[in-house]
UniProtKB/Swiss-Prot annotation:
It is found in: Cytoplasm. This is Acetyl-coenzyme A carboxylase carboxyl transferase subunit beta 1. One of its GO terms (molecular function) is zinc ion binding. It holds the Pfam family Zn_ribbon_ACC. The keyword Iron-sulfur does not apply. Zn(2+) binds at C29, C32, C48, C51. It comes from the Bacteria. It comes from Vibrio campbellii (strain ATCC BAA-1116). InterPro entries: AcCoA_carboxyl_beta (IPR034733), Acetyl_CoA_COase_Trfase_b_su (IPR000438), ClpP/crotonase-like_dom_sf (IPR029045), COA_CT_N (IPR011762), Znf-ACC (IPR041010). Acetyl-CoA carboxylase is a heterohexamer composed of biotin carboxyl carrier protein (AccB), biotin carboxylase (AccC) and two subunits each of ACCase subunit alpha (AccA) and ACCase subunit beta (AccD). It catalyses: N(6)-carboxybiotinyl-L-lysyl-[protein] + acetyl-CoA = N(6)-biotinyl-L-lysyl-[protein] + malonyl-CoA. Binds 1 zinc ion per subunit.
Length: 308
């Protein structure tokens, strides 16, 4: 065997070994680009163990890892989107719905589950960003109202994880109406004295950020989540000024008082559970103290001046 044949044989052996690695074993961090073992990333709740970047998470997995194991009831499964306007852009809306359902495995962009959090009854919902950018249409609005009604019926708190590009343009005014519809539903929840905790994940934009996502009794942001109404470029072109570094990120919003706290996804169950326990006066042995970590500065309220 010649030296060239030996090299080619080794090359074929290496390539065959590479080909034998199953697909989906490795994934790359979207921030630091570190190659990660996918099973380890899943155990870490889609948070990069190298740089702590919070990657986007599937709505169903988010709810399943957030709520207690055991009986969970999914609400609003009978609701499916309809093309009432016969809308068409480069594609028919009906075709877009079918494609989104096939790629995401969900019927629409919001999943609602009723279950328990640290032994306390709770209704939780989460946006599925892979379904047409988590856009809010009639079904999303109707499912959110069902979540509110279930919380009222069971006299428990409501938690929502938002990840959306805004209102769904293919449903025109019907999608914009969901902003008022969801806001009115939350008003009914508030009238009953029940808490609504809104968790804003990356990204939360447009009509969702301008309605239900910012109406929480407590608004929580995930680290470095993009949160806002219009996009950065649109704002810069409108005001004709450069925006500050980190504009529309959760850290910027916390600094300027737009959200109440930033919570690492891996601590979300305990932190939200502690808040729910306090807001509902529920004593659960599974709830631990939610005091700030030693690295966090305590919040202080400035004294009012003489003018009040």
């Amino acid at each position: 065997m010649s030296w060239l044949e030996k090299i080619l044989e080794k090359s074929n052996l290496v390539s065959s070994r590479k080909a034998s690695i199953p697909e989906g074993v490795w994934t790359k961090c979207t921030s630091c680009e570190q190659v990660l073992y996918h099973a380890e990333l899943e155990r870490n709740l889609e948070v990069c163990p190298k740089c702590n970047h919070h990657m986007r998470m599937k709505a169903r997995r988010r709810l399943e890892t957030f709520l207690d194991e055991g009986e969970r009831v999914e609400l609003g499964t009978e609701l499916e989107p309809q093309d009432k306007l016969k809308f068409k852009d480069s594609k028919r809306y009906k075709e877009r719905i079918s494609a989104a359902q096939k790629s995401s495995g969900e019927k629409d962009a919001l999943i609602v589950m009723q279950g328990e959090l640290l032994g306390m009854p709770l209704v939780a919902c989460a946006f599925e960003f892979s379904f047409m950018g988590g856009s809010m249409g009639s079904v999303v609005g109707a499912r959110f109202v069902k979540a509110v009604e279930a919380a009222i019926e069971n006299n428990c708190a409501l938690v929502c994880f938002s990840a959306s590009g805004g209102a769904r343009m293919q449903e025109a005014l019907m999608s914009l109406m969901q902003m008022a519809k969801t806001s009115a539903a939350l008003e009914r929840l508030s009238d009953k004295g029940l808490p609504f905790i809104s968790v804003l994940t990356d990204p939360t934009m447009g009509g969702v950020s301008a309605s239900l996502a910012m109406l929480g009794d407590i608004n929580i942001g995930e680290p470095k989540a993009l949160i806002g109404f219009a996009g950065r470029r649109v704002i810069e072109q409108t005001v004709r000024e450069d925006l500050p570094e980190g504009f529309q990120r959760s850290e910027f919003l916390l600094e300027h008082g737009a959200i109440d706290m930033i919570v690492d996804r891996r601590e979300m169950r305990q932190r939200v559970g502690g808040l729910v326990a306090k807001l509902t006066n529920h004593k659960s042995p599974m709830v631990v103290s939610v005091n700030e970590s030693p690295n966090e500065e305590p919040y202080s309220v400035p004294e009012a001046d003489e003018k009040g």
